[in-house]
Swiss-Prot record:
HAMAP family: FabH. It is an enzyme of class 2 (transferase). It comes from Ehrlichia chaffeensis (strain ATCC CRL-10679 / Arkansas). GO terms for molecular function: 3-oxoacyl-[acyl-carrier-protein] synthase activity; beta-ketoacyl-acyl-carrier-protein synthase III activity. The active site is at residues 113, 246, 276. It comes from the Bacteria. This is Beta-ketoacyl-[acyl-carrier-protein] synthase III. It catalyses: malonyl-[ACP] + acetyl-CoA + H(+) = 3-oxobutanoyl-[ACP] + CO2 + CoA. Pathway: Lipid metabolism; fatty acid biosynthesis. GO terms for biological process: fatty acid biosynthetic process; secondary metabolite biosynthetic process. Its EC number is 2.3.1.180. Keywords: Acyltransferase, Cytoplasm, Fatty acid biosynthesis, Fatty acid metabolism, Lipid biosynthesis, Lipid metabolism, Multifunctional enzyme, Transferase. Pfam families: ACP_syn_III (PF08545), ACP_syn_III_C (PF08541).
């Protein structure tokens, strides 16, 4: 059976860094308050002339180099983003042009913080069906442009960045994307949303969130979806080498680990240094895990994310 495997990983963070102390100069907060509640110490912010497609292309180039794959071999580009350059054309087609991937078709996927897991699942199925052999899956966000910088409940949480993986066709039984599970429930759409929209009022708007309730749902749904994918594949917690959760808040990661009795050293944590980058957070965490020597060939990892909608999902992969 055909199976897609991760051939390469790349990431990009803007040069500009905003620390908690710098935020405290403009909004009522402190480094101690932010770190205690979120674990976040800093976030990267895109320059005014930097677009989501720029960051996506930068991460994709590094992923292609890591995979030793030529741009002409890419058959599909999916960009998971909530903050595209424009309403249309898609960010993915702009990235396609920047990368000169002439043989690919490209489109965006919007599932907010779950976007990368959704995109991985879609690309995996294109490869399994034989429609493409190699795909670029990118998560890229400029969340700083949809923040109310006077709202300390949200502006301290988010950052900008991009991460990418190259997926390729692989018939090896012991590697690749083993399975994915996706969920959504629109009944919760008013708990995490933006105040704007193209049809709604013609403006991008800013993020609004019922933090306490979202926090509770995140722990519950991430925990349940991890157990679901383990059960589907007859695996136990101890069979998994790494748990790569959406990097929204270190307390969510800690509480999921505690609830499922996952040894904390198996949790990949990078939120401290880039904040919540929405669809970019999981590929950024994967890139960190690989570059730091944690993630190795044949390791089993679970990717798990939850985002506005609500949308949530998991991916079981052997590297």
């Amino acid at each position: 059976m055909k199976r897609s495997t991760i051939l390469g990983i790349g990431s990009y963070l803007p040069k500009k860094i905003v620390t908690n102390d710098e935020l405290a100069l403009t909004v009522e907060t402190s480094d101690e308050w932010i770190v205690k509640r979120t674990g976040i110490k800093q976030r990267h912010i895109a320059e005014n002339n930097e677009m989501t497609s720029d960051m996506a292309a930068n991460a994709a180039r590094l992923a292609l180099t890591d995979a030793c794959v030529h741009k002409d071999d890419i058959g599909l580009i999916i960009v998971a983003t909530t903050t595209p350059d424009r309403t249309f054309p898609s960010c993915a087609t702009i990235v396609q042009d920047k990368l000169e991937c002439k043989n690919a078709f490209a489109f965006d996927i919007q599932a907010v913080c779950s976007g990368f897991v959704y995109a991985i699942s879609i690309a995996d199925n294109f490869i399994k069906s034989g429609q493409v052999n190699t795909a670029l899956v990118i998560g890229a966000e400029i969340m700083s442009r949809i923040l109310d910088w006077q709202d300390r409940s949200t502006c301290v949480l988010f950052g900008d960045g991009a991460g990418a993986v190259v997926l390729g066709n692989n018939s090896e039984k012991d590697s690749g994307i083993i399975s994915t599970i996706l969920h959504s429930d629109g009944a919760f759409c008013d708990l995490l949303y933006t105040t704007g929209g193209t049809a709604y009022n013609g403006h991008a708007g800013t993020i609004c969130m019922n933090g306490t309730i979202v926090f509770e749902h995140a722990i519950e749904k991430l925990s349940a979806s991890i157990l679901e994918i383990l059960d589907q594949n007859d695996l136990e917690i101890n069979d998994v080498d790494w748990f790569v959760l959406h990097q929204a808040n270190i307390r969510i990661i800690e509480l999921v680990a505690r609830r499922l009795k996952i040894p904390y050293e198996k949790m990949v944590v990078s939120v401290n240094w880039h904040g919540n980058t929405s669809a970019a957070s999981i590929p950024l965490a994967l890139s960190y895990a690989k570059s730091s020597g944690k993630l190795k060939k044949h390791d089993i990892a679970i990717l798990a994310a939850i985002g506005g909608g609500f949308t949530w999902g998991t991916c079981l992969v052997r590297i």
